C-alpha cells in the first residue's frame, strides 16, 4: 500500500488553515515549482504533488474525508442493526446459479438486462493538462482508470469513460467532471487567457522586446514605444483551443523599475529626470 501523503505538509499550512490560506500557499508554491520557471529535475514531480494536495484541501467534502480517514476515499459504513435483505434481487440469485449449473436449471427465473449505474467523480486538471490534453491515469473507487483528455477541455466539462461505472449488463459509465485548478500565472475567460507582463521602464518608453510565458512555452513580445502601465498587448491565437479555433492571450503591462543601479545608470536616470522637469 502506498504511503499516505500529508497534504498539509506539502502546502506548508497547518491543519486548521482557512481556504484563503490554502489558496495563497498553493499559488506561491505553484509559481515556485512551475516547470516553465523551475528547471530543477524534481520541479515537475513537486508541481504535480502540490496540485494533488490543493485538489483535496480546496474541496470541503474531500478535505473532511481526508481529515477523518487520512485518504480521499471514505470506507463504506456498516449496515445499521445487522444485515438488511430488503434489497435482495431474484435476478442476482438466478444469475449466480446459472453461472454454477448453466442456464437450463434456473431458466424459470427469467433474466433481464439491466445497465449498471453511472458513477460520477471529479477530475482536477492544471491549465497545462487541460490545454494540451493527453492520457491520464486516475483512481476512482479503488480502480485505476486510463482516461483520454481532449485538448482544450473546460471547467465543468464531462469526460465519459464507457463501461467503467457500476456493475450491470452492460456496465455503467464513469463520468469525470473537469475542475480546473487555479494557475499562478494565467486566468482563463472563455477561450481567452489573461496574464501580467512585466516591462522594464526604459523599454516601455522607447519600445523593444520582452520575454513572456505562454502555455506552449516562452515567446518574445514586441512592446511599442511609449507603452503605459495597464495597456493590454494581444497575442492572437495563443489562447485556449475550441470548436471555432484558438482564443487569444492578453498581456496586461506592468512597468518595472530597477531596484539596484550602478553609479553610471543612476547618473543617466538623473539626467532623464532633469530633462523631464526642464520640459515641464
Curated annotation (Swiss-Prot):
Any Gene Ontology CC annotation: cytoplasm
Domain J: 6-70
Top-level taxon in the UniProt lineage: Bacteria
SUPFAM superfamilies: Chaperone J-domain, HSP40/DnaJ peptide-binding domain
GO biological process assignments: chaperone cofactor-dependent protein refolding; DNA replication; protein refolding
SMART domains: DnaJ
Entry annotated with the keyword Ribosomal protein: no
Major localisation: cytoplasm
PROSITE patterns, per the entry: DNAJ_1, DNAJ_2
Protein localization: Cytoplasm
Pfam families listed in its UniProt record: DnaJ, DnaJ_C
GO MF annotation terms: unfolded protein binding
Keyword annotations from UniProtKB, A to Z: Chaperone, Cytoplasm, DNA replication, Stress response
Subunit-structure text: Forms a heterononamer with DnaJ and DafA in the resting state. Three copies of each protein are present in the complex.
Summary of the function given for this chain in its UniProt record: Does not influence ATP binding or hydrolysis nor ADP release. Exerts influence on the interaction of DnaK with substrates; in the presence of DafA, DnaJ inhibits substrate binding, and substrate already bound to DnaK is displaced by DnaJ and DafA.
Family the entry assigns: Belongs to the DnaJ family.
Protein name: Chaperone protein DnaJ 2
Organism of origin: Thermus thermophilus (strain ATCC 27634 / DSM 579 / HB8)
